[in-house]
């Protein structure tokens, strides 16, 4: 993509997503995510009613009487966008590519973060960590992020969400809120990695998918290609049995995904590329209030 074309697209996305974050999401974002980051403040003597899980055993042993750690709400959050840049995101049959919607959602979240004086960073991942943008503040930083979202070229086309979660757990030393934006079409289980990551951080999953992945149209013979492996095959979509089997595969996959999120205690939302992601995000924020 030409530089002038990229800049026009950056500007167009900035105007749309900054308007959304200013006019719609500002209050909801604040109440949904503020107060979840707690920072150590001091130690004091144990008082009746204190949570015994907050006892500082080192200080208690030193003074031979119980002391507890005191925490206070962090004034600013660190927000990480974990963006899937694998080949399957370059797919779309209705309205836009999955990648385009992911870009807009990520930009909206970024502007919402900056509006609330939070830092924002990005992890681009495929089946490897493609790029890490450390969290910072400021409009210039966000415009750089949007430009990368639009024009980033990954080295790999495959997906490994487990690896991305493990990287987040290791690279982010302090607690952060991390949004995973993906279609979650990954053959490898990431349940354990998600559970571990969500103990340290606040993980939020946003699934973007195309309706034709969920339901095949009856258009006769169709050649389909796996965007990540390159494998191609012909299927007869005029067959009700073929369409039914494909739909059952999708339902089972979604059930497994929902179970993973539930067991990992991760909030999630799914949005189709032909739907309004604003409503989906508002539902997500409301769920967390």
Where are these regions (language model features)?
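Von Willebrand factor type A / integrin I
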Residues: 1-33, 42, 51, 170-174, ...
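Conserved phosphate-coordination/catalytic loops
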Residues: 100, 155-162, 248-251
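Short, electropositive alpha-helical surface patch
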Residues: 132-147, 259, 287
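Short, glycine/charged-enriched secondary-structure capping and boundary segments
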Residues: 72, 95-97, 137-138, 193-195, ...
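Short, flexible loop segments at the rims of nucleotide/cofactor-binding pockets, characterized by
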Residues: 58, 154-158, 181-182
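Von Willebrand factor
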Residues: 141-176, 188-190, 210
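Short, contiguous clusters of charged residues that form electrostatic/catalytic patches at enzyme active sites
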Residues: 104, 108, 159-166, 255, ...
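An amphipathic, basic-hydrophobic helix/alpha-beta surface used to engage anionic
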Residues: 1-130, 135, 177-180, 187-188, ...
